[in-house]
Structure formats: C-alpha cells, structure tokens
Amino acid sequence: MELEQLKCFVAAAEELHFGRAAQKMGILPASLGRHLRLLEESLGTRLMSRTTRSVALTEDGVALLEEVRPLLHRLQTLAEEFRSRKTQQATVLRIGAIDSAAAGLIPPLLHDFRERFPGIITQLVEDKSIRLIPKLIAGRLDIVFIRPRDGLNRNLVVRTLTQETPVIALPVTHPLANRERISVDELREEPLIVPERRSRPHSYDLTMKLFEDAGLHPRIAQTADEKQTIINLVAAGIGSAIVPRWTAKLAVFGVTFVPLMTVGGISLRKLPLAAAWAKAVRDPGRDQLLELLDTNIDRYAEQA
C-alpha cells in the first residue's frame, strides 16, 4: 500500500468518475486504474464496483474512505507546516566583538544590516580578542571584530577596518582636566591604570609604546581589565587611563576624556580594529555584512 494509491482512491471515491479523478490527480485514467487495482490487491478486497456507466463504492470502500480521508488531510496539513517552517527558518549570523566594536562600530552596522536583511537573525557575543579568535576557528562564530595581531591562524582572513582614537581619562578634579589636548610628555608623573597584557595586549602595548616613543617610562598604579572598571577607578582618583574614545559613552560621573597628542603635537589614532573570518567557509550572510561594512565604513568609523 502506497500513499499515491490512497490519494487516487480518495479522488475516485469523491468524483465517482475515473476521468475527472485522473484529471484531479494530474495523471492518465489508465494510471489511476492501475493504482486502484494495486491497492485492492494489497488489501485483498474490492473497493469499487465499476461499469462503463458508473463507479460506486463497495462497503469496504466506504469504510476505507472514512479512515483514509482525514488521514490524508492531516498529512497534507503537516506537509504544509513543514514547508512553511523551512521557508520561514531564518539564517543566523553569529558575530563576535570586542568591547570597542560592540560599543562603537557594531550598533550602527547592525541597525543597517537588520533593516536591509530582515530575514537574517544576528547574534552578538562580546568578549576579548584572545577568546573570540578560538571560537571563530572552532566554527562557533561566523565573523569577529577584534584587535589584529601578528601570527593569527593562516586559515583566517583579517581585514583592518579603522584606527580608533585613544584619549586620556582623567578625574574631573585633575589639573589637566580642562585642557583641549594633552601631550604624552605631560603624563610623565601621572599614575596610570592599565589592563593586564595577557588579556588586552593591544591596549597595554599602546600605552607602553606611547611612553616609549616619548622617551618616558609609564607609572603604573593599578591594573584592571574591563573598561567600566578602569573608568570607575579613574573616578575614584586611583589614576588616569589611556582608553579608546568610545569609553566616553560610559558617562561615569567624575571623569573627563581629553584627546592625546604625541610629543610633536600630532593627534593619535593608533588602536586598530579589524574583522576576521574563516577563509574556507562560504557564508552569504557574512558576505552581505561585509559588503555593507565596506560601503559605509567611514560613517561607522565615526563612532569608533
């Protein structure tokens, strides 16, 4: 017994005419007749009495119709539900981002992406670069926004997007707090709050390099990893901190943010932000995000 045989039987039972039933099924009358004969053989009973003028259901045919018709209707409903579910199943794009990207570039990017591609669900994971990269390599993320570094996995594509502007976070009571710009040379005696290098190598190295280029040694007063914690420590008067410009959005009471200059008076812009993804993986959603990013990078970079 096959599903197609049961469908042919129900069509013939409803039409009581082989020609119309065959047309309804989209097959030839001879094919319809063959399906019915095979069904009767498998059940070992006559389901229809047929003459050249009429078709009628036998008692067994009536009993079978009562059982089969609701079953076929339910199967049809289930098939439609399955097809609809598959059609509506959204693509998921898994995005990893360091705090700088999550606070600056990502919000306007995701706003535009969701408007342009409403059928793609975006999942955002915020973490440090050293944790995001292994997740990308393992296939748990589709694209990450990180601080690029030398020696990344050769199976990754890494594209630098922008250079974030570092500023100095100072307590509002600090003598330099009202300045429009501050030279690194003016921070020679300033107690600094820096992240641990093992967790945030780019941020740590940036501070070290700025002082090294100025021929100075930084005075490290405290280490802390999270930007919110660092800014809170600045507010408490523990010290000052060189941080990305976006941290001003944290709006912690008692802290001001002043642009930095090198000793020669040139404004700084030395915190690279990059996108990375798996070289061998094809992902239309990721590629659409990258295309949108390429088109609007100047506007998004303003938030960095």
Curated annotation (Swiss-Prot):
Keyword tags: DNA-binding, Plasmid, Transcription, Transcription regulation
Signal peptide: none
GO cellular component terms, A-Z: protein-DNA complex
GO molecular function list: DNA binding; DNA-binding transcription factor activity
InterPro entries, A to Z: LysR_subst-bd, Tscrpt_reg_HTH_LysR, WH-like_DNA-bd_sf, WH_DNA-bd_sf
UniProt DNA-binding region: 18-37
Database matches in Pfam families: HTH_1, LysR_substrate
Keyword Transcription appears in the UniProt entry: yes
Domain of life (superkingdom): Bacteria
Similarity annotation: Belongs to the LysR transcriptional regulatory family.
Stated name of the protein: HTH-type transcriptional regulator TtuA
Recorded name of the encoding gene: ttuA
